[in-house]
Amino acid sequence: MAQIDFRKKINWHRRYRSPQGVKTEHEILRIFESDRGRIINSPAIRRLQQKTQVFPLERNAAVRTRLTHSMEVQQVGRYIAKEILSRMKELKLLEAYGLDELTGPFESIVEMSCLMHDIGNPPFGHFGEAAINDWFRQRLHPEDAESQPLTDDRCSVAALRLRDGEEPLNELRRKIRQDLCHFEGNAQGIRLVHTLMRMNLTWAQVGGILKYTRPAWWRGETPETHHYLMKKPGYYLSEEAYIARLRKELNLALYSRFPLTWIMEAADDISYCVADLEDAVEKRIFTVEQLYHHLHEAWGQHEKGSLFSLVVENAWEKSRSNSLSRSTEDQFFMYLRVNTLNKLVPYAAQRFIDNLPAIFAGTFNHALLEDASECSDLLKLYKNVAVKHVFSHPDVEQLELQGYRVISGLLEIYRPLLSLSLSDFTELVEKERVKRFPIESRLFHKLSTRHRLAYVEAVSKLPSDYPEFPLWEYYYRCRLLQDYISGMTDLYAWDEYRRLMAVEQ
């Protein structure tokens, strides 16, 4: 096991215009303050205020948006980070681990990773992801790329269909088709930060949001040693070279994770479990009394000093006996949140310290709050009650189905841009309006300038006489469409769909 030295992980250099020379503690902290400014002032963060956490198109300001959720995650992440550093200080480990002058950057990286953790999520959350992936699967059929004979290939895109005698190109076709059918919010977050927003963050800060280490084009089984770290796609083919450089700069082995990402993940797990239940009460899906009984029933028999008793029962009893001039709902969730944090944050911090050799190496193949402990059981309790009584509620399911239809419908509306030949689309990009393509011209005008420029830059770097050029061009054209639609807010996607389907009143 390599020696633990966080100076080798908290890399304050950047991809472009990186600070040079040896820096003092204060100068390094200023570099990460610059990261904070770039992140907080970015449009991607502002858009989170119109993407909802559980209830799409929610107009009740008391119900969480992705932004308010991310701010809560940021605070919990800060709490865990401070707890870790405090315990390390007591154990006289800060200097031994190279953290004595990096406590500020340590906290800042965790906080900003928490704030950014949802920036790549499309409208309507997981149903938006599913809509994008299903739409592309129905056209690219990545599973057919593994089949024989080649005549069985149902891919509707001629350039990406497998061909006899073109095995090197066929392998690229397989990768592209697999990649495009595995849109994922975390991978899109990496793409946003580096390619679309060009935020030029420090290597360490980007490492903090690389939650999953599996490439989106991965085919086959994942290694047992990394099955948790690779359970979802973490980055796309378009960012392959950037991630390779990131691994080098952060001393990460293949498919390994940056150490501080475990803290961000734990903060998210703690935050959303309680928040989803509180939002459900706000939405009148159930009362706080009904929620308590759901929790009690799901936990089952327990002793007086059990974690359930100390956290949930304690919150319930205090909320009913407290004389504060606050509603029972407000008091219950205040105590539930405080009790949960006071138990789970120290536990997560200690798990981080206890497993630091594997975490520092990036190979710890679990979440911090995923084990056989009561703390893990408490999180599972919150999640299971939410799945059973919130996510399966008819109102929630109807909104999710509507969201799926909106995203699928928008992709179908913009499909003519993907149907153009390479030469025709190139002409449209250069001229922006082509008389013989009136529909395609108008659709192209609706795409954001940022996304169009990202496409142009990516394609312009490719040698046009390359045999792979048509494949890569089509790949980046698909990315252009995914970038545009996934970057919409819930309400914008809903309104755009209604306008283009001519149902706007």
Curated annotation (Swiss-Prot):
Record key words, sorted: Hydrolase, Magnesium
Keyword check for Chloroplast: no
Keyword Hydrolase: yes
HD domain: residues covered: 66-273
Reactions catalysed: dGTP + H2O = 2'-deoxyguanosine + triphosphate + H(+)
Gene Ontology BP terms: dGTP catabolic process
Assigned EC number: 3.1.5.1
Pfam families noted in UniProt: HD
Domain of life: Bacteria
UniProt cofactor(s): Mg(2+)
An example Gene Ontology molecular-function term: magnesium ion binding
CDD domains with a match to the protein in the record: HDc (cd00077)
Quaternary structure annotation from Swiss-Prot or TrEMBL: Homotetramer.
Family: Belongs to the dGTPase family. Type 1 subfamily.
NCBIfam families in the record: dGTP_triPase (TIGR01353), PRK04926.1 (NF003429)
Protein purpose: dGTPase preferentially hydrolyzes dGTP over the other canonical NTPs.
Protein name: Deoxyguanosinetriphosphate triphosphohydrolase
